[in-house]
């Protein structure tokens, strides 16, 4: 380490610390383990097992291009988080520079252009929301000749795209000079448009509910609902920008914080199990409903508890659905060691679900 220049930083100093501190410890430990292992049969067995296992672990790595690139990226990101560089505001100044557009040469033209855009788009959204209010909210039905799949799948994508484009357009309009964005008429029209976008999001959620009522709930449909909540939260953040004249940097940071918080929280939820429990609960209340057992079985461990509830439901003729046989197969697979997977494939959720299944047997 003393041979390195005093000005050296980053990877050179990390390598020097490893060579001067870690490497001698590793080498001396291995040397004395081998010497003592040669004079002690039990210790020697342990040392041989350790080195054999270590060599097997070292040579079993998957050095494919994709994995090398991914873990290199993770390593570099981890180093940056452990010891961040002193960049100051260098990486964020560009956002401040584009936070506001320059003042227009003809303010009246820019003002009326913005007003007419908001008025026209409010009128279009009002028409779409009025149709939804009539068919969805008042009658809770779909037009004649339109299937639930068409009503949900073909309509939802376009409506979500419309709301996202609305958010982008509002950001552009209210990054104009404050002499324009601060006008009460523009603010009022923008807030009305945000309200219409939120109503449109609730209509999409109601479309999803009608589809689930007709068929079943699945984890992707729960994910769609979570996505709608994120978009709605983004519009609320946008409302604060408009009312408080927040910068583009603030809007970006607030939205990134919202997305990170939701994604971090959702990873702890078992969406498959939630969908399975919901479907089985509705089937228990109304056995005439169609219950997609193939979907429950495809969920793996997330569907075992719900399948156990189906198996415990008394049915004429024994087990007409074959659920008990399926769960018995899961138990046999466990006894046969099928679930004793590599430690890298171990999942706490599956282990807990397996414990629940076996304890209920």
Residue ranges, per PLM feature:
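Short aromatic-rich membrane-water interface segments that cap or initiate transmembrane helices
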Residues: 14-17, 52-69, 144-161, 217-229, ...
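Alpha-helical membrane-embedded segments
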Residues: 26-31, 65-82, 228-239, 256-269
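Hydrophobic alpha-helical transmembrane segments in integral membrane proteins
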Residues: 262-289
């Amino acid at each position: 380490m003393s041979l390195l220049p005093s000005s050296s930083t980053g990877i050179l100093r990390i390598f020097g610390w490893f060579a001067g501190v870690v490497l001698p410890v590793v080498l001396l430990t291995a040397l004395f383990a081998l010497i003592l292992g040669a004079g002690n049969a039990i210790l020697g067995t342990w040392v041989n097992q350790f080195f054999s296992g270590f060599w097997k672990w070292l040579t079993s790595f998957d050095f494919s291009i994709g994995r090398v690139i991914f873990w290199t990226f993770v390593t570099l990101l981890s180093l940056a988080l452990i010891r961040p560089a002193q960049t100051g505001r260098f990486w964020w100044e560009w956002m401040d520079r584009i936070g506001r557009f320059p003042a227009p040469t003809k303010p009246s033209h820019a003002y009326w252009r913005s007003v007419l855009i908001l008025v026209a788009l409010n009128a279009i959204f009002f028409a779409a929301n009025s149709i939804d209010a009539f068919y969805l909210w008042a009658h809770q039905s779909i037009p004649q000749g339109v299937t639930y799949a068409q009503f949900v799948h073909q309509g939802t994508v376009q409506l979500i795209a419309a709301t996202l484009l609305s958010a982008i357009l509002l950001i552009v309009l209210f990054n104009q000079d404050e002499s324009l964005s601060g006008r009460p008429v523009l603010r009022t029209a923008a807030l009305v448009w945000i309200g219409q976008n939120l109503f449109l999001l609730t209509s999409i959620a109601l479309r999803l509910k009608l589809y689930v009522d007709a068929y079943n709930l699945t984890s992707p449909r729960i994910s769609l609902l979570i996505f709608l909540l994120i978009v709605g939260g983004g519009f609320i953040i946008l409302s604060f920008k408009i009312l408080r004249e927040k910068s583009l940097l603030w809007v970006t940071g607030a939205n990134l914080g919202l997305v990170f918080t939701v994604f971090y929280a959702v990873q702890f939820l078992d969406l498959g199990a939630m969908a399975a429990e919901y479907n089985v609960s509705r089937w228990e209340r109304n056995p005439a409903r169609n219950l997609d057992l193939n979907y429950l079985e495809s969920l793996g461990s997330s569907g075992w508890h719900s399948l156990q509830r189906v198996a415990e439901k008394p049915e004429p003729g024994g087990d007409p659905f074959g659920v008990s046989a399926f769960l018995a197969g899961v138990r046999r697979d466990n006894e046969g060691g099928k679930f004793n997977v590599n430690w890298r494939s171990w999942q706490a959720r599956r282990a807990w679900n397996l414990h629940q299944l076996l304890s209920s047997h």
